[in-house]
Amino acid sequence: ATVLGLDSQADAREIRRRVDYLPGDIALYDQMTGRELLKFLANLRGGVDWNYVEQLAERFQSDLNRRIRKLSRGNKQKIGLIQAFMKRPELIIMDEPTAGLDPLMQQEFYALVGEVKAEGRTIFISSHIVPEVEHICDRVGIIREGELATVEDVHVLKDRALHQLEFRFAQSVPPEVFANLPGVRDVVVEGTTLNCTVVGSPDAMVKAAANYEVVGLSSREASLEDVFLAFYDGDSPNAA
């Protein structure tokens, strides 16, 4: 395996120099203050720009003078975020990075991620909060039953995977004509309007609709959560 083009075993020391990590279940030295802990970690990593550490603490509204054992879950998470960002590593690996953060601090985290991306650095995030992933990530991997089901740019996966379609016909149509088409699901007919979800290409659905008088057609962009659920429902949204 390689990380940043380096062999994960032969180049382990160099990888550690260029990578930082935030675990999902963060464990800190409770007897230390936030400042003491960050200085300790900074020394282990060969020193950091302490002015940048102070800027991060200000952004996350983190009191570095309090003992860690007295901090709430969210405030401990802030310390974890600061230690992950403070070295300005090329790659940051994070597991559930916004756990325990209030909405304002989540937005601050998203802004910081945007700045890191703009600098050409990489953040690898594991998260169950699908809207968060959609908001901040360029590429996404979906794991299903312990295996990597797909890796795609977010916009490509959304465009290719799911289509939310609404057809308006001149008269009511039989839903069973459409419900059995490949990739078509959740067919609902109300009056002369038909709504459905299409996994993969909508070609079969469009051709079937052409057998009736269509007076209107609209589509809604699928969310990443829609795509995620499609994988776990057993569909195969990778079909082009």
Regions from the PLM with identified roles:
Residues 1-144, 148-150:
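ABC transporter nucleotide-binding domains
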Residues 5-7, 26, 66-68, 154, ...:
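Short, well-ordered turn and helix-capping elements at secondary-structure junctions
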Residues 11, 153, 204:
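Short acidic active-site motifs
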Residues 109-197:
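ABC transporter nucleotide-binding domain
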Residues 163-240:
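Short, charged/small-residue-rich alpha-helical element at the C-terminal edge
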